[in-house]
Each structure stands twice: as C-alpha cells, then as structure tokens.
Design a protein with these regions (language model features):
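Solvent-exposed alpha-helices and their adjacent loops that cap or buttress functional pockets
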Residues: 31-32, 36, 72-73, 119-121
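Flexible, glycine-rich terminal cap/loop adjacent to redox cofactors
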Residues: 65, 82-92, 97-184
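Short amphipathic alpha-helical segments
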Residues: 36, 76-77, 136-138
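Flexible, acidic loop-helix segments that line cofactor/substrate-binding pockets
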Residues: 70-85
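Small-molecule pocket liners
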Residues: 22, 77-78, 127
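Hydrophobic pocket-lining residues within nucleotide cofactor-binding pockets
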Residues: 17, 43, 76, 110, ...
Length: 184
C-alpha cells in the first residue's frame, strides 16, 4: 500500500546518478549527482505530494535559468480531503518527543470562530499550534472545514520562523475561519 519512487529500470546507473534511500539524491536546487540532470516529484523520495513536486520543478527551472532559489521541506502542507478536513504543516508532537525537543502546544476549538459555527452546523474542529522555546511557530494541525484553505497561512509562519507575536501582527479579515490562527 502507498506510494514509493520507482528508480529501477530507468538506467540511472548509466549516468552515475546516486540513489538516496528510495529516491534519487538531489541537492537544494534539485540537481542530481549528474551535472545536467535534475529530479522533481516522487522520484526524489522526499514528499510524495503534487504540490511539493510543483515547487521542486519550479526550483529546478529557476536554477537552470540562473534565478537564485532553493528547495525547503520545512513547511510542506499535508491535507486529508474528508469531511471534516484535516490539515497539517511543520512538526508534530510525536516527532518532537522522539527527538527530545521541548515545545508548547496551544489548542483552540474551531467553534471559537463565529464563521466556522455558521458554516459547519453542529461541526466540531480543533486548531493546534506548536511552538518552540523561543515561541517560534514550528507546527500547526487543523481539524475542520476549511482546513485545506487555512493551512497555507500557518505554513508561511513555519517556513519563515515567525514567533507567535510576529504572526499576530498580521491582520486577518473578519469574519473568517482563518482568524482561528490569530486567536491560537
């Protein structure tokens, strides 16, 4: 079950392209060990999500064109398109515990948002924000509609290392469900 990169039978060994784990080894510009071969998408083995592949391809194209750009896997959103939706970006509590890292968790019910209540009759949900010792946002996990539309905002905070105070200086439109991030 699941997906995995298929690197066999591609003839990569003929080009001396290195394999790392289950995928093709690439650098931050998506360049393989061969100076003229780039890789993006599932074949890299990092994140088997279409939106990651789009970004990896963009980074590769930028590098080919001489435009400075680097791939970062720090804040790739993952979404489960169910009802209610689930969305996640950044680190998880389990990951942090396993690595012995200290962190804080702030949980707030999605029903704190009047817009969420109006659009999700009898709906429940949760926003969980994870911060490090310096109060930097390092993870966000959402349960409730429209989590898939909100998670990108949290991803920007994770990717850029915003503290909670820096993040809260952003003005969120009212009434929106995304305000839940501001309230967390």
């Amino acid at each position: 079950m699941g997906r995995r990169p298929i690197t066999k039978s591609l003839g990569l060994e003929n080009l001396a392209i290195e394999i790392q784990g289950a995928g093709v080894k690439v650098n931050e510009h998506m360049l393989t060990s061969h100076p003229h071969v780039y890789a993006a998408g599932d074949i890299t083995g990092f994140s088997l999500l279409a939106h990651t592949a789009y970004r990896e391809a963009e980074v590769a194209i930028h590098h080919i064109l001489g435009i400075p750009d680097e791939m970062s896997y720090k804040a790739i959103p993952a979404v489960v398109y169910t009802n209610p939706e689930l969305a996640s970006v950044g680190k998880t509590e389990e990951e942090l515990i396993a690595n012995g890292e200290s962190f804080r968790v702030q949980k707030i019910p999605m029903t704190y948002s009047g817009r969420f209540v109006a659009e999700n009759e009898n709906g429940n949900g949760l926003c969980k924000l994870i911060t490090d010792d310096e109060d930097r946002i390092i993870g966000c996990h959402l349960l409730g509609n429209p989590a898939s539309e909100i998670i990108v905002t949290a991803g920007i905070a994770v990717e850029n290392g915003y503290t909670v105070d820096e993040f809260k200086k952003n003005i969120f439109p009212h009434p929106t469900v995304s305000e839940i991030l501001h309230e967390s």
